[in-house]
From Swiss-Prot:
Comp. bias (Basic and acidic residues): 7-23, 37-64
SMART domains: HMG17
Protein name from the UniProt record: High mobility group nucleosome-binding domain-containing protein 4
Signal peptide feature range: none
Transmembrane segments: none
Pfam families for this protein: HMG14_17
Organism the protein comes from: Bos taurus
Segments of skewed composition (Polar residues): 65-83
Key word Acetylation present: yes
């Protein structure tokens, strides 16, 4: 059985070799590409006053002396000391 000839054979008969089909038809190639529409500008959010960061919305202000029991993880001991101290004040 004879071997097949490659498309780009050196001997190649141009009449027998089929040309590759065009990717786009002539009608589509004649039309210019449509211009892209300009992007719309984004709307700026309306300002309703001063906003805090998400993590600080519900927290009370921290005093500057550093006696914040929640931050120092002594909340249970500080609360128990305050409860004992109020009973002795009478």
């Amino acid at each position: 059985m004879p071997k097949r000839k490659a498309k780009g054979d050196a001997k190649g008969d141009k009449g027998k070799v089929k040309d590759e089909p065009q990717r786009r038809s002539a009608r589509l190639s004649a039309k210019p590409a449509l211009p892209k529409p300009e992007p719309r500008p984004k709307k700026a959010p309306a300002k309703k006053g001063e906003k805090l960061a998400k993590g600080r919305k519900g927290k009370a202000e921290v005093s500057k002396d550093g006696n914040n029991p929640a931050k120092n993880r002594d909340a249970s001991t500080v609360q128990s000391q305050k409860a004992e101290g109020t009973g002795d004040a009478k």
